């Protein structure tokens, strides 16, 4: 009997031996294989990418300058990329992987990497001896391509494929690269200083031009902004005017409509008041009629009855009573006529007195007015002295001269006060009195 062995795409399965003394090897990648017990040998070979770091220390170049070069190489065991996989094995895969299996079968990945690394370092040393420092340092890609081109056939015969090879670092212990860099740096610095000066000059010119352009753009923009602002303000003013006009018209229309509504309301109120007054007049008229009927029932009819009784009594008392009543009525009539005549005469006398006073005032002028003033002075003095009537005690502080001065000043204030109250200049009136001094 036997076992079934499987493998993934990153691993090769090498099957050798078999029944009847077979010497054919089979290589399976990403498949499976049957192995008989005791007579079949099954081994595995990794197909993963191997990263190598070749390093050559103090290797002399063609100029005798010792350099140390480090690189990075990516390698893997070759296999076909176009073979057709079957369930058991593939002849092309057997052929391509046969060399690698012969070289590395049974070895670990570390041992395989060490073998490839030594081969790459040997070719790297050989190529370094044919190049100058400048060629190695300045054109690393060309150097790496050359190493890969030279080393590829050798590692290919071992069934190894170089996927990539790059130079990681180049340096030396004799300061050759530093010295080379200093000279180049000096040249570069010189050119750089000149370039900086020219660049500064060009930058200054360009900056001035840019600043001028920026200022032109700024001024142009400011001008446009001001124009737009002015247009905006003008349009806004026009819009505001239209809005205010519309608001004013709306307000006027509202006020007019409100006035009309108030007028209609007032008319309705007036109509209501008219109706109320009419109703009130009707009610009052009805009340008058009611009172008239009431008076007729309570006063007139009893009075008529009483008159009829008195008339009956008068007739009973015959002519004496009638004549007495007539005499009394005549007496009362005459008394009323006399009183009315007296009142009329008193009114006429009062009117005549007022007319005569007016005539006298008009004829005598200031004298009449003086008479009025003189008649009014006691009343004015009484009114002025009225508050003093409530005074219990008056204390005068100062000498007799002060009292005299106060009295004089008080008296001197009377004419202006009278003039302000009555419109009469008391000084002028008194000056017209014979023997008086103003």
From Swiss-Prot:
Where, subcellularly, is it found?
Membrane
Its BP terms in the Gene Ontology are: cell adhesion; melanotic encapsulation of foreign target; positive regulation of filopodium assembly; protein localization to plasma membrane; regulation of myoblast differentiation
Q: Which GO terms describe its molecular function?
A: protease binding; structural molecule activity
Could you name the domain of life of the organism this protein comes from? Answer: Eukaryota
Keywords, alphabetical: Cell adhesion, Membrane
Among InterPro entries, the record links this protein to: Band_7, Band_7/SPFH_dom_sf, Flotillin_fam
Name any GO cellular component annotation: cytoplasmic vesicle
Known SMART domains for this protein? PHB
Subunit info here reads:
Heterooligomeric complex of flotillins 1 and 2.
Role of this protein: May play a role in axon growth and regeneration. May be involved in epidermal cell adhesion and epidermal structure and function.
Record-stated family:
Belongs to the band 7/mec-2 family. Flotillin subfamily.
Protein name, please? Flotillin-2
List the source organism.
Drosophila melanogaster
